[in-house]
Amino acid sequence: MILEIADIRITPGKQAEFDAAIQHGIETVASKAKGFKGFKVNKGVESPERYILMIYWETLENHTVDFRQGPLFPQWRAIVGPYFAAPQVVEHFTLVAKSA
C-alpha cells in the first residue's frame, strides 16, 4: 500500500468552504479512482490555511497514472483547485512500522 501525502495551502479565510469542497471532492470523485483505499484530511492548528491530505492507494501507479492521468483528475482539481494559494507538495510513502 502507498500513502500519498499532499501539503496544501489555501487562500486565507476560505477554510469553511474548502472543508466542504475537499470532503465533497473525495467522496464524489477521488474515491471512485482505481486503487483508492481511504483518506484522512487534517487542518493546521497554528496555520489554519494549511491542510495535510493523506490518501491510501493500492499501488503508486494507481495515483500517478490511473488517477492523475485519467478522467477523474480534472474533476477533482475543478472542485479543490480554486482554493489553492500555492502549488501543493505531494510525496508518496511506504509503511515502515505502526502501532497495534
Would you name each region that the model predicts?
Residues 2, 40-52, 75-100:
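Glycine-rich beta-strand-turn "strand-cap" elements at beta-sheet edges
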Residues 2-9:
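Short glycine-/aliphatic-rich beta-strand segments at the starts of folded cytosolic domains
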Residues 9-22:
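Short, surface-exposed ligand-recognition loops at beta-strand->loop->(often short) alpha-helix junctions
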Residues 16, 61-63, 98-100:
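Residue-level signal for secondary-structure boundary sites
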Residues 24, 28-36, 56-90:
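An amphipathic, aromatic/His-enriched active-site/gating alpha helix that lines ligand/cofactor pockets
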